[in-house]
């Protein structure tokens, strides 16, 4: 099972290297990684997605706490949260496919960030499912390049049932 870990670290040289070294020694692949400043000065938030069962992730969390500069580690896999990714995707187009490609961009509320006679660069922001869905739809045009961030997230503080909301959005098409 894929687990999402949110790790707060002191923003100092070598912290990410020590974390990735720990994962490498344990034979773990990091499927997704995003690092950036947190709300406190001198603190960074690392969001990573790793594969493993619950027991293995617990052990990994304990090992992370043993590293210098680790302030907090939280497995947020089953905690309601707001998740986002960003993807830039360059596709081939021509006069016959341009309208269809632009319609897909509109439906997904993506943005055209560059356009030429024979290509589009599209910016898509959303949950991982949205990113995968638009990528699959754009495959038929001929994907030239993709750049995709890792997942970022913040834990929700409200008690709103997000699965219920997702189902309502799909049901009403908004």
Swiss-Prot record:
Keyword set includes Transferase: yes
UniProt GO MF annotations: acetolactate synthase activity; acetolactate synthase regulator activity
Cellular component, GO annotation: chloroplast; cytosol
EC category name: transferase
Keywords for the protein's UniProt record, in alphabetical order: Amino-acid biosynthesis, Branched-chain amino acid biosynthesis, Chloroplast, Plastid, Transferase
Superkingdom of the source species: Eukaryota
Domain ACT: 4-78
InterPro entries referenced in this protein's UniProt entry, alphabetically: Acetalactate_synth_ssu, Acetolactate_synth/TF_NikR_C, Acetolactate_synth_ssu_C, ACT-like_dom_sf, ACT_dom, AHAS_ACT, AHAS_small-like_ACT
Principal place of residence: plastid
Pfam families: ACT_AHAS_ss, ALS_ss_C
Similarity field: Belongs to the acetolactate synthase small subunit family.
PANTHER family per UniProt: ACETOLACTATE SYNTHASE SMALL SUBUNIT, ACETOLACTATE SYNTHASE SMALL SUBUNIT 1, CHLOROPLASTIC
NCBIfam families: acolac_sm (TIGR00119), PRK11895.1 (NF008864)
The protein's assembly and partners: Dimer of large and small chains.
UniProt-recorded name of the protein: Acetolactate synthase small subunit
Taxonomic path: Eukaryota, Rhodophyta, Bangiophyceae, Bangiales, Bangiaceae
């Amino acid at each position: 099972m894929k687990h999402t870990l949110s790790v707060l670290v002191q923003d100092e040289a070598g912290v990410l290297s020590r974390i990735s070294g720990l994962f490498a020694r344990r034979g773990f692949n990091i499927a997704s990684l995003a690092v950036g400043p947190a709300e406190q000065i001198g603190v960074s938030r690392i969001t990573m997605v790793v594969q493993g069962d619950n027991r293995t992730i617990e052990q990994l969390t304990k090992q992370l706490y043993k590293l210098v500069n680790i302030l907090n580690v939280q497995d947020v896999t089953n905690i309601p949260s707001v998740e986002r990714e960003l993807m830039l995707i360059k596709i081939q187009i021509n006069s016959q496919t341009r309208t269809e490609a632009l319609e897909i961009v509109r439906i997904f509320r993506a943005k055209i960030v560059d356009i030429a006679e024979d290509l589009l660069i599209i910016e898509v922001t959303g949950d991982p499912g949205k990113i995968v869905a638009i990528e699959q739809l754009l495959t038929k045009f001929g994907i030239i390049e993709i750049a995709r961030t890792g997942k970022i997230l913040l834990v929700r503080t409200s008690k709103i049932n997000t699965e219920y909301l997702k189902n309502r959005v799909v049901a009403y098409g908004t």
